[in-house]
Amino acid sequence: MKAITTTQAKDHLDELINAVISDLEPTIVSNNQGQQAVLISLDEFNSWQETLYLLSNPTNAEHLMASIKQAETGQIIKQKLPDLLEL
């Protein structure tokens, strides 16, 4: 993860924003007092928020983890979208 100072961020803000978006890589920004914040793209932030929401419900989290385990062990069933819409 890239780390820069607030002065560097101010001097190159447009470039920094473009890099964070294109590289999908968060950047740590530190001020003179040693405080730090992280700059991420809005899409990445929204993705993290959605993941937190989905995993905040224990039942939903358990179902998602079981589904991931099934996919990793090849226990999947391929279906076409029209077939799923009929369910």
Curated annotation (Swiss-Prot):
Keyword Metal-binding: no
Biological process terms in GO annotation: regulation of DNA-templated transcription
Key words of the record: Toxin-antitoxin system
Matching InterPro entries: Antitoxin_Phd/YefM (IPR006442), phD/YefM_antitoxin (IPR051405), YefM-like_sf (IPR036165)
GO molecular-function terms, A-Z: DNA-binding transcription factor activity; sequence-specific DNA binding
Pfam families for the chain: PhdYeFM_antitox
Family: Belongs to the phD/YefM antitoxin family.
Assembly behavior: Forms a complex with YoeB which inhibits its toxin activity.
Physiological role: Antitoxin component of a type II toxin-antitoxin (TA) system. A probable antitoxin for the putative mRNA interferase YeoB.
Name of the protein: Antitoxin YefM
Native species: Synechocystis sp. (strain ATCC 27184 / PCC 6803 / Kazusa)
